[in-house]
Curated annotation (Swiss-Prot):
Organism whose genome encodes this protein: Clostridium novyi (strain NT)
GO biological process, one term: translation
Keyword Coiled coil in record: no
One Pfam family cited in the UniProt record for this chain: Ribosomal_S21
One term under GO cellular component: ribonucleoprotein complex
Keyword Transcription on entry: no
Record's compositionally biased regions (Basic residues): 43-60
Protein name, UniProt field: Small ribosomal subunit protein bS21
Recorded family membership: Belongs to the bacterial ribosomal protein bS21 family.
Gene Ontology terms for molecular function: structural constituent of ribosome
Amino acid sequence: MSEVKVRDNESLESALKRFKRSCAKAGVLSEVRKREHYEKPSVKRKKKSEAARRRKSKVR
C-alpha cells in the first residue's frame, strides 16, 4: 500500500499528485484491473503467447 505524508507547507494537490505517482510506480491499478475477474490458466497462457508474438513481430 502506498503511503504519503503531507509535508509542512505542502498543498493537498501536490500530496495527492505524489500519492498517485507512487501508486502508478507500484503498479497498484494495473494489479487491480488484472485481478478484477478470474482468468483461467489456459487463457493466461494464450494471452501471454499472443503478446510475445506481437512483440516479436513488432521488432521485425
